[in-house]
Amino acid sequence: MLKAIAHKVFGSRNERYLKGLRPLIEAINAFEPQIQALSDDAMRARVAELRQEVAEGRPLDDVLPETFAIVREASVRSLGMRHYDVQLIGGITLHQGKIAEMKTGEGKTLVATLPVVLNALSGKGVHLITVNDYLAKRDAAWMGKLYGFLGLSVGVIVHGLDDQQRQAAYGADITYGTNNEFGFDYLRDNMKFYQEQLVQRPLNFAIVDEVDSILIDEARTPLIISGQAEDSSTLYARVNALIPMLRRETHFTVDEKARTVLLTDEGVARMEDVLKIDNLFDPANITLQHHVLQALKAHHIFQRDVDYVVKDGQVIIVDEFTGRLMPGRRYSDGLHQALEAKELVQVEAENQTLATITFQNYFRMYKKLSGMTGTADTEAVEFREIYGLEVISIPTNKPMVRKDFPDLVYKTQREKFEAIAADVKDLHKRGQPVLVGTVSIEKSELLSDMLKKTGVPHDVLNAKNHEKEAEIVALAGHAGKVTIATNMAGRGTDIVLGPGVTDLGGLHILGTERHESRRIDNQLRGRSGRQGDPGSSRFYLALDDDLMRLFGSDRLKGLMDKLGMEDGEPIENRMVSRAIENAQKRVEAHNFEIRKQLLDYDNVMNQQREVIYSRRRELMGSDEPETFVQEHIEEIVDEIFAPFAALKGEPDPELLEVAAAQIEDILDYKIELADGGEAEKQAVLEAVTGRQRELAETAGAHYKEVARYFLLDSLDRHWKEHLLSMDHLRDGIGLRGYGQKDPKQEYKREGFELFQQLIYNMRDAAIRALSRVRIRAEVQEQEFQHKDETANVQYSGPAESAEDAKKEPKRREAPKVGRNDPCPCGSGKKYKKCHGAK
């Protein structure tokens, strides 16, 4: 009640924000006559002066009105387009690090030029992030005319560029590219060995186009760079052949909402019988158990032509949000291999994670982040909670006149599609263009076959023919055109109405199913009614649609039966629409929780990643890597002799033997310790340090590179093993809940212990190698050139788990584990016989 009164008196937060921008808009408009009077050269010269002023410390906010006025005039002269006042509002919103929600056709591409030019004045780089290579190249070429007119340089990051081309693109004032390319470049940079090989500058300011798609839809998809692990392709084929023997509900259960599969007791017994093993859950059989579950997922959760397609003997992932094919991307954790075995194509070798990051953590590294989209308001809470981004709805330049008709609900898929085909035929007869949105390739092809039978000419736009995407979308608004599009394929290309279409009612949007997110439905609707054009939309649903089936259609079915509805007769009322919206809200909340969980777990990894990556940068950029070597040697010697400093009386001979063995193992120095006192400690330190000095004299100028090589090589090898250990920990952490422990807290605690172990292991391995290296006086620098880790790797999408690795990394003995205690890895062996074995 109080909220409603306050809203009436003061207006909404959005309205107050927009009102507060009026003085700035007036200031920009006041500059216009002055800027219009400048020649092209004078305008360029003024931009150069502004750059100098900003470099000398003048805040960007001070130069905003003049810069925006310059960009507006430059746009008129170079592109023939003038920014409306509402577009200036969008530009200010983006500059202030917020999300600008702008309806389709309101010129988001042009709006971005305002904050891009303003922030480019700092010389620190501006990244404009799009959803695909086509849009990155198109926008860079199109808006590049404006930037070039003002004397600013533009680069484009697309798939297939080499490091030199990437360095040039990142060195430009403004860089366009896709979220994947930016993220993978960050990971690749943190696998490089020399500073001059780095391609990215520090992350300054990013504008994310279609921000909802990138920061929300793809947030569950970590970026993963992986290399090949040991081959187990024959095992996939063997397990795949056993799957038909298992019966659903009897041998296994499927949870479609959570997309998980579980074996029942009967299923476990059946598998043990056919695999000729005693216990499927024995640690020795963990790989077999994993293969069985992945094969079940491949057969019973992942559907051909919905989740993936088979093309040229390869399983290619279909992006669930855009319907586009994603060649080169592979499911990790052996799921892709299970799908290959299912489809009887060649099974490729499995992968091991080399580097990974989520989009959530990558984008939060930017000093300033903002975004644009046509639909963000439904996820405003998530943007605020996870990214600290406020969503501002920008008013349209002309009022929206599109008519959104209520949903029609049918009993079955058959009735629904027959009604759709009949309505499309009627609309086509009238000449009104129709855009039909489907949720999968399978459904788009089913509808296409039905329309062929009724003689309606049409275009199909799905992952199988996205090469013609822009061309098909550009013509979709012409009279008589019928276009079937999978999901939101074709976003970013405006559908312009052809001659005479306005009189026919504009573009009609026909949705064949509600998406689990209201935002995706709104995106489909938003293709019609751009810039004040007429248009209409309607969704057709069936009680056996996935959303309805999984999230409560029983009450509706009962209602339809009570009403005694005939076959083919739809129901259309508010209660139905409300029930559907509630189902969508439940799914959205469920997905938000999943993304939040992912972030909570990844935050643990992120803190560790930041420490390791900043250490790498420090080593790469250091002129004196030998100082790290000296520090490490001193730390190791201190730790080995620490137990003796606290002792009163004679030390235990066994303890002295252990210490001497450690000195020989890590420092390659033989000594018989008498008492472990300060004198012996200094003797060891002097001997080991002296040998490093000799090494430095022999190697001369190359010693620094040798030291850097061993330090970085050790860091990279152990970081890879640590990623694997963290994956294993993550997979099993859910079981801690059965022991009345919070899995998240346990993951943090155990993850920290593993990380401490990693730090020790990296240090010890580097010094162990450096203590044994022998360098000839005529050493060649390339002998210590590090092989390029990024040469033969794969870039992949969602990492559901990482059970695929076979090798548990060797860990330093932790003080909390006794040598006769059970090993913490879960093998059931004593620690001294397992990971405590030297």
Swiss-Prot record:
Q: How is the cofactor bound?
A: May bind 1 zinc ion per subunit.
Instruction: Report residues binding ATP.
Output: Q87, G105, E106, G107, K108, T109, D494
Segments carrying the region annotation (Disordered) are 781-838
Binding-site residues for Zn(2+), renumbered to this chain: C823, C825, C834, H835
Catalyses: ATP + H2O + cellular proteinSide 1 = ADP + phosphate + cellular proteinSide 2
Q: Which residues form a coiled coil?
A: none
In short, the EC number is 7.4.2.8
**Transmembrane region positions?**
none
Cofactor (UniProt)? Zn(2+)
Question: Which Pfam families does this entry report, sorted A to Z?
Answer: P-loop_SecA, SEC-C, SecA_DEAD, SecA_PP_bind, SecA_SW
**Function, please?**
Part of the Sec protein translocase complex. Interacts with the SecYEG preprotein conducting channel. Has a central role in coupling the hydrolysis of ATP to the transfer of proteins into and across the cell membrane, serving as an ATP-driven molecular motor driving the stepwise translocation of polypeptide chains across the membrane.
**What protein family does this chain belong to?**
Belongs to the SecA family.
Q: How does it assemble?
A: Monomer and homodimer. Part of the essential Sec protein translocation apparatus which comprises SecA, SecYEG and auxiliary proteins SecDF-YajC and YidC.
Q: What is this protein called?
A: Protein translocase subunit SecA
Question: Which source organism does the UniProt entry give?
Answer: Solidesulfovibrio magneticus (strain ATCC 700980 / DSM 13731 / RS-1) (Desulfovibrio magneticus)
